[in-house]
Design a protein with these regions (language model features):
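A conserved ligand/cofactor-binding region detector
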Residues: 1-562
């Protein structure tokens, strides 16, 4: 009974908070449990069909997404050696042919490292195998970097009493890909630079994709039927066909129907939020949407500061907003991510401050969508007018929300980051709104310590007033709290650089660019609709069908089943 209870605990809470040792241990057990079960099942199925495990690399390809499933590699070696009587070199060679690694983020916390002592205690046999892999890998590195011991130590799988899962993937996987062109370049030139210099043929870019079957045909049936009306062929089977609607951006009848679809989707969301949260929103307002995982690099905080900026602007000049704006947030924070939760509290305080102020009636409104999930996204994304893709340039690997929004006719305001760059290349710079510094510019600021947010604070009165609102003024009446830690982090830093996500650095550019977005919607609605049509027409490239085709052409080499 005790063994059964212990075993069941592994699968009771998926991915628990890992800000304490018990959470880390449970998470490692879960990773191993899932990896081992998958490898055992794969071996069993292969033997049932082919009988001979020597042919495994001819029939099996395993794509590791992030480092979470990386334990599958040493686990497969364990099965082959300990249960199937393969030698070390045979098992090692098979794993190197079978596994491929997709990196999805450059954030440090995603580059998983396990405490070596904990790992040895929980998974002793897997630890032995990883030690042998590390020794073999470091021997190979020493051929190329014979006089650079520090570099080899950084690239090693084991170092500083840690087991580095990203380095394990780099050591064993046949191909390594980023999920956008920029992301792949960053992997090659920064994150895995040492490996890339030795094995450049291993590295490539395959941009992420989304399925039009869910995010158009299911989530936005009005737009799906409109596109089908004007396109010859099945757009769900051939993503290239979306280009056929491009000429209709100049067709008044088509644009009128397109605009009506958007309005109906906004009415649908307004009904949803009224039913679920009791909030009334104006479907005639501009729906400005920031919905994604809550993380500092995704810069929900920048949007918060911008709303405070507009709030203060309206207080001084009520005529500055003629068409109302509904600012919509939807996000969840990781259980142990304190700063992310603090930003959610800030959003709620801003929501209360804005929505309870009679001066904001008919001007701006703030909505935080509760319990955000795919089902809610299917209602929210088709309703959006503005898509906020404002991550710190160089930190978003790709993003897929940006693709879902542009496909559904929202115009993007964003940085040159991740797949935003490729969206801009396809729709044209005139059909997207880009602001802020580049990935290279941000990298240089960090490397050469040239950034001082205090200068922006002192020289930009509007931004200074916004920052001060975090610790004084109207905001403090709502939520009964100061946001001193956020203020401190923006201007002075905490045990490191100030404003590490360059929020104040990009704030002036964001204010200027957003004004252009607003004026286009208010003063030139016909042009807005044309740009939205272009975005939908160019969304075909971002189909997951194209992504899968490229994985197959460049990595898997699978034959289609007819």
């Amino acid at each position: 009974m005790a063994d059964q209870t212990f075993a069941e605990a592994i699968s009771k809470v998926l991915y628990p908070s890992d800000d304490h040792m018990q959470g880390k241990m449970l998470r490692l057990k879960q990773f191993y449990f899932l990896a081992s079960a998958t490898m055992q099942s794969m071996i069993k199925r292969h033997k049932a069909v082919f009988d001979d495990l020597n042919s495994l690399p001819e029939h099996v390809v395993i794509q590791i997404n992030e480092t979470h499933p990386a334990l599958a590699m040493p686990e497969l070696m364990r099965i082959l050696m300990d249960e199937e009587d393969f030698g070390w070199d045979e098992a090692y060679g098979m794993v190197k042919k079978i596994f491929h690694y997709t990196n999805h983020t450059i954030m440090t916390e995603a580059m998983e490292c396990w405490d070596e002592n904990m790992f040895r205690l929980l998974l002793p046999r897997i630890y032995q195998i990883i030690c042998a892999i590390n020794e073999k890998y470091c021997q190979k590195l020493s051929v190329y970097y014979s006089k650079e011991e520090e570099k080899i130590a950084q690239m090693a799988v084991i170092g500083n009493n840690e087991i580095r899962m990203a380095n394990l993937c780099v050591a064993l996987c046949r191909r390594i890909n980023g999920v956008s062109n920029l992301h792949a370049d960053i992997l090659k030139t920064r994150i895995f630079k040492g490996s890339y210099q030795i094995f450049p043929q291993k590295y490539l870019a395959i941009t992420n994709g989304i399925t039009h079957r869910r995010w158009l045909a299911l989530a936005n049936q009005g737009l799906y039927h409109l596109v089908r009306e004007y396109v010859k062929g099945d757009i769900l089977k051939d993503y290239h066909l979306f280009e056929q609607i491009l000429p209709y951006k100049d067709d008044k009848e088509f644009c009128k129907k397109y605009e009506k679809v958007k309005r109906n989707n906004k009415i649908r969301f307004a009904k949803y939020i009224k039913e679920k949260q009791g909030i009334e929103v104006n479907p005639e307002s501009i729906f400005d949407v920031h919905c994604k995982r809550l993380h500092e690099y995704k810069r929900q905080l920048l949007k918060c500061l911008h709303i405070i900026y507009i709030y203060q602007k309206i207080k001084k000049d009520p005529t500055c907003i003629t068409t109302p704006i509904t600012f919509i947030f939807a996000a969840k924070a990781a259980p142990g991510y304190a700063r992310a939760k603090e930003i959610i509290r800030l959003i709620h305080s801003i929501q209360e401050m804005v929505n309870k102020d009679p001066d904001m009636d008919g001007k701006i409104q703030v909505v935080f969508v509760e319990n955000y999930c795919v089902s809610v996204a299917e209602i929210l994304i088709p309703a959006a007018d503005i898509s906020e893709q404002i991550s710190t340039a160089g930190m978003e690997a790709s993003g897929t929300g940006n693709m879902k929004f542009m496909m559904n006719g929202a115009l993007t305001i964003g940085t040159m980051d991740g797949a935003n760059i490729e969206i801009a290349e396809r729709v044209g710079q005139e059909n997207i709104f880009i602001f802020g510094d580049s990935a290279e510019g941000n990298y240089n600021k960090k490397m050469y310590h040239t950034y001082n947010p205090g200068i922006i604070f002192e020289n930009h009165p509007g931004i200074r007033d916004v920052c001060n609102c975090l610790i004084e003024g109207n905001l403090l009446r709502y939520g009964n709290r100061k946001y001193s830690e956020i203020y401190q982090n923006l201007l002075f830093g905490e045990y490191g650089e100030a404003d590490p996500y360059y929020i104040l650095a990009d704030f002036p550019s964001y204010i200027e660019t957003y004004e252009k977005v607003y004026r286009l919607y208010v003063d030139h609605k016909d042009e807005w609709i044309k740009k939205a049509v272009v975005n939908t027409a160019k969304s075909g490239y971002f189909s997951s069908d194209r992504t899968i085709e490229q994985y197959n052409e460049k990595i898997w080499n699978l034959k289609p089943v007819k």
